[in-house]
């Protein structure tokens, strides 16, 4: 029986690396995978692949707010059997797309593995994360650590001087140096 999985964490926990490793494991056994990543991440660089911080890459389809995932996946699956769907940056999915993914699991019987952030720099849920927390069959937290050694489960956005940014757009692109993964204790200490 196929399931919808949501692998979530703070930044720098290796989500993309885990996604690419999972895809490789399927492919190594002669199974076909289909990878997606968010258009919002790709717009600036015009890329159509997933790249981990340690250098692993794979081509990927792009989704945006209008993408009908169930329809796209159904068409591709009819052409040639897909054994697993893997979605990077799944926190950018919307409610309808998460429901589409439940249909991929329940109707097409294809497992779907989603990887993304749970919350933003203000500790607010992303839309995709909210709906995946509600609809996923399995919730798996990937671990990363705070500078104090505790498990990091929050993200702080910082400016060039290392000061915490408390307001602004939920989505801001730049390098990983603009974000720091911290535990809840240090989130409260630094954010408030």
Swiss-Prot record:
Transmembrane segments: none annotated. GO terms for biological process: DNA biosynthetic process; thymidine metabolic process. Pfam families: TK. The keyword Lyase does not apply. GO terms for molecular function: ATP binding; thymidine kinase activity; zinc ion binding. Its main location: cytoplasm. It catalyses: thymidine + ATP = dTMP + ADP + H(+). GO terms for cellular component: cytosol. Its EC number is 2.7.1.21. The keyword Ligase does not apply. It is an enzyme of class 2 (transferase). It is found in: Cytoplasm. Disulfide bonds: none annotated. Keywords: ATP-binding, Cytoplasm, DNA synthesis, Kinase, Metal-binding, Nucleotide-binding, Transferase, Zinc. InterPro entries: P-loop_NTPase, Thymidine_kinase. ATP binds at residues 9-16, 88-91. Zn(2+) binds at residues 146, 148, 183, 186. The active site is at 89 (proton acceptor). Homotetramer. HAMAP family: Thymidine_kinase. Belongs to the thymidine kinase family. PANTHER family: THYMIDINE KINASE (PTHR11441), THYMIDINE KINASE, CYTOSOLIC (PTHR11441:SF0). This is Thymidine kinase. The lineage of its organism: Bacteria, Pseudomonadati, Pseudomonadota, Gammaproteobacteria, Enterobacterales. The gene is tdk.
